[in-house]
């Protein structure tokens, strides 16, 4: 029992270096994918680039989840800034809003007050289990074709913070990045990024929430 307690305590400690390295690897893969799109300038290549970007966006969201649990740094302000800047803000996710949503999920898991179940119930029977491979494949194709945008918007509405001040930094960040890319004739990067955000990111996100245990 003592060994288990020791292992649990070690896992509960912030892991800044591991988090930063994982974040850099994901952004490196995204940068390489974007370079491939620039180099080949081919629609088929763009399709696979969007798949890769969406997959790595999902990985960044998982790193953001760790940051929401304060697993990045003991300094909470530093923890939240890094989590937002490198993981959540580029995805359009607000950290305080997500944290409230997610912590309530842990507190009310499996009950009628569980916000994740509320979201799933709004799209019933899409999340009705068991979910066969054929149905999962059909949902994947639907998501890739950007036919689940409404569902993405529903989830975004669940994580909007109540305090207006919590919107300032993320909006300034997004506005600055968008302006810099457009001014440098890199609007195509925005197009690929946002298409991935509402298609392949959601496709991989759906797969995970359908196969992971509830908790």
Briefly describe each language-model feature range.
Residues 1-54, 88-191:
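Non-catalytic, topology-defining segments of multipass membrane proteins
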Residues 54-64, 94-96, 140-152, 193-215:
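Transmembrane alpha-helical segments that form the membrane-embedded catalytic/substrate-channel core
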Residues 59-62, 84-88, 104:
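Generic beta-strand or strand-like secondary-structure segments
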Residues 62-69, 73, 105-106:
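Active-site recognition of the HExxH zinc-binding catalytic motif
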Residues 74-81, 94-97, 199:
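Short acidic-hydrophobic sequence patches enriched in Asp/Glu that either
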Residues 74-88, 117-120:
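Post-HEXXH active-site segment of zinc metalloproteases
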